[in-house]
Curated annotation (Swiss-Prot):
Signal peptide: none
Disulfide linkage: none
GO biological process: L-cysteine catabolic process to pyruvate
GO molecular function: L-cysteine desulfhydrase activity
Organism this protein belongs to: Clostridium tetani (strain Massachusetts / E88)
Pfam annotation, one family: SDH_alpha
Taxonomic lineage of the native organism: Bacteria, Bacillati, Bacillota, Clostridia, Eubacteriales
Superkingdom: Bacteria
InterPro entries according to UniProt: Ser_deHydtase-like_asu, UPF0597
Protein family (similarity comment): Belongs to the UPF0597 family.
HAMAP family hit by this protein: UPF0597
Name this protein carries in UniProt: UPF0597 protein CTC_02309
């Protein structure tokens, strides 16, 4: 595969539809697989997850319900989940299924545990029926099943080296530079990346629902009152989409690098500003493609789940690059936008997926616009400031090091605080 083809493949692999927050939905996906392998009615199911999955799934709405959390997602998947639907595993859900799922929880059919001592994304589902038992393990990536067992017999297992085509494909982007990504976006036939437009339309659709129905906090609705202001409009659209998604509104979003909220930030500021400034469709698509690629590039260093808010430090940085491109910025200005953003917003913590994420996305969009505007005026934060370096690539690597090695205890403390509130 040539380098151009590889970047197209990375985009197609990392930019996919997701119905609901990806962490509880990843659990629902694992549950559906365990149920299918079991081949009979589930009598008991154990769901074991790492700290990040637990944190991100704790307070987020589940699509098509007014319920929150991993347990209800798992119970619903026992009722209606189909693994063939991937991150849209619960799309067949009806109102009649909700009481059935609640009954499973009430009868202690489903149990949720925090799995200690695991590194990175980890989901283990153990299902038992009258005669059979099944086990599914997901690691490193929301859809990356590394182990399937039935009655103690291994059906399928992936070695660590082969355990994630998706992760390995994502990390292939490290072999490119930001210049390579811009050159690709400049020169690729628009037909080859036109699928990006599907995500623009999808995320605009949920944004409209969020704003029209005043879902969530009402932040999008507040900002919408100033929609003649281009910047406020971009913030309103992105916040409104996030409020709809975090509320559990039953519409899919186009994700980016494994996260639906990343997809909202990577796409909607560019699409909204492009719309207001009457940029042509092709320019918007190319700009969003660059935003996705930079987001994926950063996530290859920060990891699928991180103690820092990826909507800020990954998708927000991607959006700043895409916005700079939308406004005909040079390569040097795109470098500058990336570094400005890293200098400004690094360190925003991720304390789980919930309605408050809408405000974090609002801050991310605002910062990405500021970073791009600064760069377009050749205002660059100096390379010797903080964690920045001479190149955008090295600055991103430094960001990854701080976000992983430097904040290794952060998730543990955040979760401790969240659980203390429940006691």
């Amino acid at each position: 595969m040539n380098r151009e083809g590889l970047l197209i493949e990375i985009l197609k692999n990392q930019v996919v539809p997701a119905l609901g927050c990806t962490e509880p939905i990843a659990v629902a996906y694992g549950v559906s697989k365990a149920k299918e392998i079991l081949g009979e009615e589930v009598e008991h199911m154990e769901v074991n997850v790492d700290r990040s999955i637990f944190k991100n799934g704790k307070e987020v709405g589940i699509p098509g319900t007014d319920k929150k959390g991993i347990l209800i997602a798992a119970a619903l998947s026992i009722i209606v989940g189909k693994s063939e639907y991937s991150l849209q595993v619960l799309k067949d859900l009806t109102n009649e299924d909700i009481p059935k799922a609640l009954e499973l929880i009430q009868n202690n059919v489903v149990k949720l545990n925090l799995k200690e001592g695991v590194k990175g994304l980890y989901i283990e589902i153990i299902a038992s029926g009258n005669k059979n038992k099944s086990r599914v393990v997901i690691k490193n990536n929301h859809l990356n099943i590394v182990l399937l067992e039935k009655n103690g017999m291994c059906i399928e297992e992936k070695s660590e080296e082969k355990s994630s085509v998706s992760v390995n494909l994502r990390d292939e982007i490290r072999n490119f530079t930001i210049k390579d990504l811009k050159d690709f976006v400049d020169n690729i036939d628009i037909e080859d990346i036109y699928f990006i437009n599907e995500g623009i339309a999808m995320n605009k659709r949920i944004a409209k629902e969020g704003l029209d129905n005043k879902l969530g906090l009402g932040l999008g609705d507040l900002l919408k009152s100033e929609e003649n202001n281009v910047i406020e409009y971009a913030k309103a659209v992105t916040s409104g989409a996030c409020e709809a998604r975090m509320s559990g509104y039953p519409l899919p979003v186009m994700s980016s690098a494994g996260s639906g909220n990343h997809g909202l930030v990577a796409i909607l500021p560019i699409a909204s500003i492009g719309e207001k400034l009457e940029k042509n469709e092709e320019k918007v698509i190319r700009s969003v493609a660059l935003s996705h690629l930079v987001t994926i590039y950063i996530k290859s260093y920060t990891g699928a789940l991180s103690p820092v808010c990826g909507c800020g430090v990954a998708a927000g940085v991607g959006a700043s690059a895409g916005l700079c491109y939308l406004m005909d910025g040079t390569l040097e200005q795109i470098y500058g936008a990336i570094k400005n953003m890293i200098a400004g917003i690094s360190g925003m913590i991720c304390d789980g997926a919930k309605l408050g994420c809408a405000y974090k996305l609002c801050i991310s969009v605002s910062s990405s616009i500021d970073a791009a505007r600064m760069a377009l005026k050749n205002i660059f934060v100096p390379s010797n400031d903080g964690i920045l370096d001479e190149t955008a690539e090295k600055s991103i690597q430094n960001l990854g090091k701080v976000s992983t090695d430097g904040m290794s205890c952060t998730d543990e403390v955040i979760l401790e605080v969240m659980l203390d509130r429940c006691n």
